[in-house]
Design a protein with these regions (language model features):
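Hydrophobic single-pass membrane-targeting/anchoring helices
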Residues: 2-101
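Acidic/histidine-rich, surface-exposed loop or edge segments in extracytoplasmic proteins
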Residues: 106-125
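Active-site scaffold of zinc-dependent metalloenzymes
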Residues: 165-200, 216
């Protein structure tokens, strides 16, 4: 169910999108310049051997042909039986993904000890690394309940330029997620135009990036990439809409991440600042690949208030709700 709109725009038309087995393509990040043009991340969605997967082992049975003057033995053809080891497997679906069953929400944590914020790259790294175990504790049980694969996210705070499997990245742009790793530009958010630094901003953006990790682990990120490939690329009209659905879902998951923290784990003003920051990001006049500022605000608050994964099913939302 999408978040309530400020105005009544009629009934919602469901859009169900399914992934294929084709190779996915990554999306290109937009560097924010003004408050209305700020985007939350690059939204890269590439896959690698680090993605949840399994290997097949072959069991082969053969017989040898033998020929004698008095008899001939018929040969049996070689057979290979693939076997999938037990354990959680990613599900490459979108609107009907098992993560959207109705009883799933992030779990409360007994406090989250965060250091005093120091806006140097080293200080940002200490703060974010301290927050991650709290976020992992909220989300890991969700994956266990749905029998989906789980692994902790990695975080790299960098200065200058860094190389990633999704391409190079400079620290004059927003954070980027790629294949199990959050690449965080040291110093960028402390000097972002239009908004002074605040610890809540960092938690809000970390929640969004972790939202991409949820998509990657579950298989939705690959399914979305496949759907964009089928649509002719991420920069087609349909491809951009798919990208907005993906990014707004990460924003909604980010709102869910902030929900347990608002139950006394950290000061409430830090949570509120994280929600406010996410509510003031969007495409503005730039490439429409992350969603409007209004829709970013609606989805982050919807995720925060409901704390249910099915509330973040942007794949089933009306097109107006993901504009």
């Amino acid at each position: 169910m999408p978040p309530p709109r400020r105005k009544n725009n009629g009934p919602i038309v469901a859009l169900v999108l399914f992934g294929t087995v084709l190779l996915g393509v990554g999306t290109i990040g937009i560097i924010a310049a003004t408050r209305s043009d700020r985007v939350s991340d690059a939204g890269y969605a590439g896959y690698s051997s680090a993605s949840p997967t399994y290997t097949y082992s072959a069991t082969t049975t053969t017989t040898t042909d033998t020929t004698a003057p008095s008899a001939t033995t018929a040969s049996k053809s070689t057979s290979t039986t693939p076997s999938k080891p037990p354990g959680p497997q990613a599900v490459y679906k979108l609107g009907d993904h098992p993560l959207f069953r109705g009883d799933l929400g992030t779990f409360d944590v007994n406090g989250c000890a965060l250091p005093k914020m120091d806006y140097s790259p080293a200080g940002e790294d200490r703060f974010l690394q301290a927050a991650l175990p709290c976020i992992e504790a909220m989300w890991k049980p969700v994956f266990q309940r749905t029998e989906l694969p789980y692994q902790p996210v990695e975080l790299q705070v960098f200065t200058g330029t860094t190389q990633t499997p999704c391409g190079s990245r400079q620290n004059n742009a927003t954070a980027m997620y790629c294949r199990g790793v959050i690449y965080w530009p040291g110093g960028f958010y402390a000097n972002e135009a239009g908004m002074p630094p605040h610890p809540g901003k960092y938690l809000g953006q970390l929640g969004h990036e972790y939202g991409h990790h949820i998509q990657w682990l579950s298989g939705m990120l690959k399914a979305a990439d496949n759907a964009q490939y089928d649509a002719g690329g991420w920069d087609t009209r349909t491809g951009l809409e798919l990208n907005r659905r993906k990014e707004l879902q990460a924003t909604c998951f980010g709102g869910m991440t902030l929900a347990p923290l608002s139950h006394g784990a950290i000061p409430l003003d830090v949570v509120n600042e994280g929600l406010s920051d996410a509510s003031n990001r969007g495409d503005g006049s730039r490439t429409p690949d992350h969603g409007s500022t209004e829709n970013n605000g609606r989805w982050v608050m919807h995720g925060h208030k409901t704390n249910r994964t099915n509330a973040c099913n942007t794949w089933m939302a009306n097109a107006a709700d993901v504009a």
